A protein has these predicted regions:
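Aromatic- and charge-enriched surface segment that lines or borders ligand/interaction sites
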Residues: 82-133
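N-terminal lobe/hinge region of extracytoplasmic solute-binding protein
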Residues: 39-88
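Surface-exposed binding/hinge segments that line
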Residues: 118, 127-128, 132-178
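Second-shell loop/turn segments in exported
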Residues: 49-52, 101-110, 156-159
Length: 178
């Protein structure tokens, strides 16, 4: 009788455990629309133009598009730019912006179109705030180092121009591989 009772309890425990395990693996009937991710630390700010901390960069990379981006294979593809050209000497990059690119508020409401002047203003803001990320472009963009170090206070001498609302142009000091 003890063996039979022991077998019965073992079998009942096994069935119960399997049931719990299978129910935990099942699909929920309502799919969550929230993506959760744990970052190693909180960002001190979301001002990606003024700071270059990993916590900020990781979050902002999911919120803000650049002119170009990498596809799943690492190839450069358009993002905010629909097309771009590089001069033969490798010093001038001209980007044509998508007409449908928009800025949105934190509530998700359309705010304004993205324009070429936004890129000029953004670089000037980063330079004026002495952004921690300027080291990435300071020696590449023509005139930027002189502006940052105070050799000139005229930002129009920096190699970034809005040619029209949809076209932004960067002039470099020397050709870059990236």
């Amino acid at each position: 009788m003890k063996k039979s009772k022991s077998k019965y309890l073992t079998l009942a425990g096994l069935v119960l455990g399997t049931g719990v395990l299978l129910s935990a693996c099942g699909n929920s009937s309502t799919a969550s629309k929230t993506y959760n991710y744990v970052y190693s630390s909180d960002p001190s700010s979301l001002n990606y133009l003024a700071e270059n901390r990993a916590a900020t960069s990781d979050i902002v990379a999911n919120l803000v598009d650049g002119l170009l981006e990498n596809d799943q294979y690492g190839n450069i593809i358009p993002s905010l730019a629909e097309d771009w050209t590089v001069s033969q000497d490798g010093l001038t990059y001209t980007y044509k912006l998508r007409k449908d690119a928009k800025w949105f508020t934190s509530e998700g409401e359309e705010y304004a179109p993205v324009t070429a002047q936004d890129f000029v203003t953004g670089l000037q803001y980063a330079a004026d705030k002495k952004s921690e990320a300027l080291y990435l472009v300071q020696d590449s963009v023509a005139g930027l180092d002189d502006y940052i170090t105070g050799k000139t206070s005229d930002f129009s001498t920096v190699g970034v121009k809005a040619l029209d609302d949809q076209t932004v142009q960067y002039t470099l000091v020397k050709p870059e591989l990236y």
